[in-house]
Amino acid sequence: RPACAAAGTADNDEPPTLAVVVPLRAPATVAEFCARLPPILRRLGVRHHIFAANQVDALPFNRGALVNAAFKALSDARRARRHDWPRFDYVAVHDLDRFPAEANASCAASIRGYYSFPAGAPRVLHPNSFAGGVLVLRSALYRAVNGFSNVYWGYGEEDNDLFLRLRWCGLPPRHGDAVDACMVHDDCAACRKQKRDLDKKGSADGARLRGHEERLRARIAQPRRHMLHDGLSTFNGSVVGPPRHEPCGGSTITTFDISLAGIAGAAT
């Protein structure tokens, strides 16, 4: 599609640089993530920087809006020349608890391609999701589909909404090789509790998820209409204070504290 055509070409002649964006909320810790992922990226020769988007308000967690917040903060900082970050040619939207299975020697060949520059379609590193867990895509394509929707509060469906946008572009994500065996998911305790709570009778989280499922079904036919008015361009949360820079497994992690209180229709 013409609106997505620019996302299929290279941005520059330099080796591509990856921004790893990790949406989270305290007290979640990045200790294990930093111990495991950065050494893998260095061994693979991937130029990268890691960013955490930390939700600091009391609203339900909003993974998609947090990624939009980080992407916008990076773009704004680069335009204002507030940091010496390079242009990030591609992005890995990365769950905190999912990693390549380096201990499995038979996975070495598959893992080599996981975080490489996705010149064509995005790459998803989750065996049971169309766009969740870990999604690697070009920055230009993320902008072309207007990023994530901002309206999926709590658990679920923001990744499927993004899939509809990418499919509309003609670039639905493809699964990485052998991700069922070669990506490890160490589900956090809070995540397991949240998933259990979804099934409880009268659960607010469960009711919210059912509302998300209805919204998603309503968007299937015309994702373009919705993505123009809900996404990166309409994000109106805020970064609270300056970013924090900390060591992360031999790399650096930059944390943006994000308040989503300004988003229209927050937590509906």
Locate predicted features:
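Short, conserved alpha-helix that lines the donor NDP-sugar binding/gating region
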Residues: 63-75, 163
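C-terminal catalytic/acceptor-binding lobe
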Residues: 151-154, 160-268
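Juxtamembrane luminal stem/stalk of type II transmembrane Golgi/ER carbohydrate-processing enzymes
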Residues: 1-17, 33, 248-268
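A recurrent flexible, glycine/aromatic-enriched loop bordering the glycosyltransferase active site
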Residues: 120-137, 144
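Short, well-formed alpha-helical segments that are part of the catalytic scaffolds
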Residues: 27-41
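Short beta-strand-to-loop acidic/aromatic patch adjacent to the donor-nucleotide binding site
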Residues: 79-99
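Conserved donor-nucleotide/metal-binding helix-loop-beta segment in metal-dependent transferases, i.e.
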Residues: 81, 99-126
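Hydrophobic targeting segments
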Residues: 16-22, 37, 49-52, 70
